[in-house]
């Protein structure tokens, strides 16, 4: 059994594990409990009342957080002609066609998100075995397969996050850095929660927003009261 460090033990003492906190208080606690010597990422986790085995309850999408995530995303765009120029003008880090497909096949992954125009997907699709396991495959549901490359790049650079329910009906999404102002983390959490409520499947029965929590990279999980969103 792994030994719990002294700093982590101190952080655990700050949190009542049986209590669900208002989001503002939860953020304050997360900051007090953050003991690492780097700018920890704050992540929100949700347990939803859906059955991921049912096709119409496999929640997946993307959303631009009001205050971004605090992380600069490196964007690779597969496009040609005018769309390639559009991507470059929008600030994409890498733009190309077959040359980048070859680089990826050789183990190059110096990017965080891929955007592809639909006419490039026949070629990009060949990278499925490489990109799929890493969660990097472009997808229309997340706005990364599109001819609107300028908007796609701008959204990603502005702090767009992807969300996807796992097989246990959980969703995990970064909502910022521990260095963010409290209100920015609160705003991001509330906006994300409202977005998840918007995409609630019609076939979902009972309580939809079962529970939620936030945690920093090295900190304890802190339950958040989401009863107002159910």
Swiss-Prot record:
Pfam families: Ribosomal_L1. InterPro entries: Ribosom_uL1_bac-type, Ribosomal_uL1, Ribosomal_uL1-like, Ribosomal_uL1/biogenesis, Ribosomal_uL1_3-a/b-sand, Ribosomal_uL1_CS. Keywords: Repressor, Ribonucleoprotein, Ribosomal protein, RNA-binding, rRNA-binding, Translation regulation, tRNA-binding. Binds directly to 23S rRNA. The L1 stalk is quite mobile in the ribosome, and is involved in E site tRNA release. This is Large ribosomal subunit protein uL1. GO terms for cellular component: large ribosomal subunit. Part of the 50S ribosomal subunit. HAMAP family: Ribosomal_uL1_B. It comes from Oceanobacillus iheyensis (strain DSM 14371 / CIP 107618 / JCM 11309 / KCTC 3954 / HTE831). Belongs to the universal ribosomal protein uL1 family. GO terms for molecular function: rRNA binding; structural constituent of ribosome; tRNA binding. GO terms for biological process: regulation of translation; translation. The gene is rplA.
């Amino acid at each position: 059994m792994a030994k719990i460090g002294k700093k982590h033990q101190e952080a655990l003492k700050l949190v009542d594990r049986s209590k669900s906190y208002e989001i503002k208080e939860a953020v304050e606690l997360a900051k007090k409990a953050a003991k690492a010597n780097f700018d920890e990422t704050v992540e929100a986790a949700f347990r939803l009342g859906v059955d991921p085995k049912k096709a119409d309850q496999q929640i997946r999408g993307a959303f631009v957080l009001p205050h971004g995530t605090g992380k600069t995303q490196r964007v690779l765009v597969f496009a040609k002609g005018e769309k390639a120029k559009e991507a470059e003008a929008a600030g994409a880090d890498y733009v190309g066609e077959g040359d980048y497909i070859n680089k990826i096949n050789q183990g190059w992954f110096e990017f965080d998100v891929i955007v592809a125009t639909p006419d490039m997907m026949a070629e990009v699709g060949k990278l499925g075995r490489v990109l799929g396991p890493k969660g990097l495959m472009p997808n229309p549901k997340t706005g990364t397969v599109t001819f609107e490359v300028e908007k796609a790049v701008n959204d990603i650079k502005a702090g767009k996050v992807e969300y996807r329910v796992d097989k246990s009906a959980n969703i995990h999404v970064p909502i910022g850095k521990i260095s963010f102002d409290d209100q920015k983390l609160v705003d991001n959490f509330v906006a994300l929660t409202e977005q998840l409520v918007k995409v609630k499947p019609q076939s979902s029965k009972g309580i939809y927003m079962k529970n939620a929590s936030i945690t920093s990279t090295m900190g304890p999980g802190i339950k958040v009261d989401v009863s107002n969103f159910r």
